[in-house]
Amino acid sequence: MEVKAGGIATLLTKFRKTLGRLIDGLFVLLAVPIVCILRLLFPIAPVRFGFFFADRIGHFAFDVEYFLASLECDRKSDKYTNLFFLVGKVANQYLLDLAKRELYIHRLVRYLYLADKFVPFGAKALIPARHLTGSRDRRGLYYSTNVHLNFTSEEERRGQKILADIGIESHEKVVCLIVRDSAYLNAE
């Protein structure tokens, strides 16, 4: 019925989605043996898979920093190799670049994560703070840890130059307000 109403455009969209699901399924099947090998190696080289929502800059920034802060507080987390993928369209590429300095993030990890759910006795997947805490620092980690997403010296210098270009010197205090219209969520 939808194809009749939408014509060839609807048919092509449905075909593309179906093909995408088939390709995803194939990649998940190919990832199952890798996950099985990682399970065997888990006692000596534990690996966990997780994800971050990247479609909202605030949630993305918080979740990455919160995860890094929790690693700093929980020393037994050091034994894990953590691999991540992103969910949603990346809201801010620069923030992603900062996150990639600290974490391994790659789209193919999604298939390992999905395959891990199919293999019995799975390792505990990493769940983003957005699900666990509503992207709130309920444990006070921000106040008890160092900042993890840092600018390089060159980035700091460029930022100081941009501020100087608009009349703000490095010694001056600045107040930033984060305000957005709800229309932002509907904008592309």
Question: Model regions: which residues?
Answer:
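N-terminal targeting/anchoring "stem" of glycan-biosynthesis enzymes
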Residues: 1-188
